[in-house]
Amino acid sequence: MTEDAFFARLFARLPKPSDAWVVPPGDDCAALAHGSELLLLAVDQIVGGKHYYLTGPHETPPEAAGRKLLARNLSDIAAMGGVPTACLLAGAFGPARDPSWLERFYDGTIALADEYNVTMVGGDLASTPNDDVASLTILGRVEADRVCRRSGARPGDVLLATGTFGSSLGTGHHLSFTPRCREGRWLATHGFAHAMMDVSDGLLLDASRICQASQVALRLDPDAVPRRTPQTTVAQALGDGEDYELLVAVGEEEAEALLAQWPFADVPLTPVGRFLAAAVPQIVDSTGQPIAVQGYDHLS
């Protein structure tokens, strides 16, 4: 069973949320009506030996691990077009983690929180005989009429991607990435985004989630996807994951204006495909042949 299939079964068992929950489970954040704005809520975690490494050639400084924990959550707020405001951090750490290591871990989180004006308002700390697990819950806000969801892509929309893709582990990007809060906020406030999400599990897999949520197909140009290094292959760009870039669906007429107005010279914005009407949500190539979806799945 895939991760998405598991969650579909789980969500079907949950009570229907009240109308105050404008965005229910299944998007990058949940969203609760709060006056003229929405309160955004998301949670993400990192596991030692999976999201950062305790030993070996990719051994991770504790500051980098703590930074990554918050950065992953900031990327979810960015995907909704929101502004991050506060967070809570809960961690269970193994016996080798002395107070000095823990302080350095929290230093990494706090430094990034200061950079993004996020207040750490609470959390929990525990020990474990196993690998570290740390979870962060983030809160944010967005205007009710500007929130971006996965489900708004329309036939004819252009799919654009920020940044570059692939080779995340080899380049250290999986630790040093910049959450696209600035870019996501700009796209939301300027009204360009019909749908948006961040890429954590690979471009193909996350693009397929937009297709599923929006009930459309996507004609993707794999060769158009910007690669992180000259050595990065197309397959790596499509499936490696941990890119933490944004995928955004924009109307065909608006796409040209968006590219002309894009103010972030340090972050490329690239058209990589077009959404199509289809009976089955899927990703196809230029000839209409389905592209096998690849990416990181925690249950596969």
Predicted regions span which residues?
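Active-site-proximal betaalpha loop/short-helix elements
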Residues: 96, 175-243, 276
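Glycine-rich anion-binding loops of enzyme active sites
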Residues: 33-36, 83-169, 274
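Short hydrophobic/aromatic beta-strand micro-patches
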Residues: 139-141, 247-251
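General beta-strand structural signal in soluble alpha/beta enzymes
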Residues: 22-24, 40-43, 119-123, 161-162, ...
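Acidic, Ser/Thr/Pro-rich beta/coil linker or hinge segments at domain junctions
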Residues: 259-300
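Residue-level signal for inorganic ion chemistry
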Residues: 31, 73, 81, 120, ...
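Short, conserved charged micro-motifs
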Residues: 99-100, 147, 253-260
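Extreme N-terminal cap/leader segments of soluble proteins
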Residues: 1-60, 80, 85, 89, ...
